[in-house]
Every structure is written in C-alpha cells, then in structure tokens.
C-alpha cells in the first residue's frame, strides 16, 4: 500500500492553488512539474512516502487559470516560492522535470535552502538551446492558438509517442491525465510561458547555477525528442556537486520508460 497522500488548497495572491502532500519527518521533497502535465505526474514518487509536496502551478492541473496572471518564467518561479512560504516550506530537497526547472531560478538566489537536487530532462536554463518543433509552433502568434484549438485527445496521444524512448504509445491513463485538464486556461498559460522563453532568456536565467552547491543528480533519457543529452552534460557541468546519469533507450519521462528511476531518485534523496 502506498503512502497516504493528502490533497489541499490554498490561496496565494488571490489565486486558488491545488497541492498534494505526504506528511513525514525531516526535510520535505518538493516535486516541480512541467508542461503539459501537473502534480499528478509525481504520484509514483509521492506514493513512496514523505515528507513530500507537489503543487499544481496556476494554469495547470487542478489549480486556477486566471486570465490576469504572470505566466512568465520569472512570474511562475516567484509564485512557486510564495506558495512554499505559505505552506511553511523553507529548506527543501528539490526534484524538477521539464518546466519544473523554473524552481532553479529561486534556488540560485537562495542555494542554502536546497539540501539536495534532482534534475530530470529539464528545460535548459543554459546557453545554446533551440526549441523543439511543437514549442516553435506555440511561440508563433496565431499558429499556437490554431494548434491548441485543433488538438484532440487522439492527436495529443500521437504527439506524446515521441516522448517515449521507443516511440510507443503513452499509457492511456497518462494521456487522460493531461487531456482531462487541457482546457482553454491551460492552453493560454502554455502559450504565455513559451512566448516568454526566448533562448537568451533561458540562458540568462541559469547564469548562477554554480551557486547551487548541494549534492545533485542529473538524470536524462538519451531518446528525449525535446531536450538533447548535451544539456544533461551542461547541467552536470554547471552544478558543482552533480552526478550525471544518461539512460539508454529512455525518453522525456524516464520514470515511465524505466520505473526503476523512482528508486534511483528516492535513494539519492535519502
């Protein structure tokens, strides 16, 4: 039987925020999701015990989707920190995936608050990245709106095949987890975030990664269709105390292609 996962809500800056929490003793692990997923993405980790926390960021999952909200990189990063403060989280272990990398913006400013760090196939806050083709469409005004308006569950499932290491279909519950929350508000938030994220802004956001001196683990699938493995190496080079593991035949969500990744991450976190 898995750990008891508590569900809760809080209001931060007038925005309704949903979160999942697993109680326990010690430093909590904060799991930071990417796009187009949300906190449910982390259930395989949360079910193994706590203390742990996974927040649905505004615009995604079961949190609100306010029209007047700062969905920029720095806006979302700052909002996450306000959520953590509201929940009484200061020192933390940090696990980031995809756009969860935005948590590293605050970690560079307050590295003493991060006890351990795991970076999994994350958006590169590093020089030299160029967006994958879907993101390039999202970043084009009019084109991104058209793509989102014409997306169906079937086309989403087809697109997600490229996220698998062997390009096989994603498990239907995973597709449902995304599709059930892929509404107009999430689509709007997605476009706002990607359009804020010019490559030079990504690089500038990670200029002080070398300040994060805690033990770190970088895990990356060598078949990630969105984020080439050279950025795994670049993250490992930028973080002073990082280990690097590149997983053969694994895609963008390593714990789906290789469930043993959950054990590896939890073992590293201690």
Specify the residue positions occupied by each region the protein language model found.
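Active-site loop/oxyanion-hole signature of alpha/beta-hydrolase fold enzymes
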Residues: 54-96
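Catalytic histidine-centered segment of alpha/beta-hydrolase-like enzymes
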Residues: 250-259
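Flexible "cap/lid" loop of the alpha/beta hydrolase fold
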Residues: 116-146
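Acidic catalytic loop of the alpha/beta-hydrolase fold
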Residues: 223-227
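Conserved alpha/beta-hydrolase catalytic His-Asp/Glu region
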Residues: 128, 149-210
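Alpha/beta-hydrolase fold catalytic core
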Residues: 1-29, 49-50, 89-90, 263-270
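Conserved HGGG/HGGXW glycine-rich cap/lid loop of the alpha/beta-hydrolase fold
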Residues: 21-62
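Short beta-strand/loop motif that positions the catalytic acidic residue
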Residues: 212, 218-220
């Amino acid at each position: 039987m898995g750990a008891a996962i508590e569900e809760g809500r809080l209001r931060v800056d007038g925005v309704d925020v949903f979160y999942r929490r697993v109680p326990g003793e010690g430093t909590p692990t904060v799991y930071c999701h990417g796009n187009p997923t949300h906190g449910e993405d982390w259930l395989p980790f949360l079910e193994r015990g706590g203390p742990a926390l996974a927040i649905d960021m505004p615009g995604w999952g079961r949190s609100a989707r306010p029209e007047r909200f700062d969905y920029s990189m720095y806006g979302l990063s700052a909002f996450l920190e306000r959520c953590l403060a509201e929940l009484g989280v200061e020192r933390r272990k940090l696990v980031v995936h995809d756009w969860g990398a935005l948590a590293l913006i605050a970690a560079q400013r307050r590295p003493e608050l991060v006890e351990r760090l795991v970076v999994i196939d994350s958006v590169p806050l590093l020089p030299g990245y160029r967006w994958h083709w879907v993101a390039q469409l999202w970043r084009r005004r009019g084109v991104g709106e058209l793509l989102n308006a014409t997306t169906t569950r079937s086309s989403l499932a087809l697109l997600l095949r490229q996220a698998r290491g062997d390009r096989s279909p994603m498990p239907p519950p995973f597709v449902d987890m995304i599709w059930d929350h892929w509404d107009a508000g999430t689509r709007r938030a997605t476009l706002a975030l990607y359009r804020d994220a010019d490559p030079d802004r990504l690089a500038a956001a990670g200029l002080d990664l070398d300040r994060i001196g805690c033990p770190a683990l970088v895990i990356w699938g060598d078949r990630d269709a969105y984020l080439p493995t050279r950025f795994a190496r670049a993250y490992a080079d930028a973080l002073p105390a990082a280990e690097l593991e590149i997983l053969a035949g694994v895609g963008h969500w390593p714990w789906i292609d290789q469930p043993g990744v959950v054990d590896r991450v939890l073992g590293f976190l201690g």
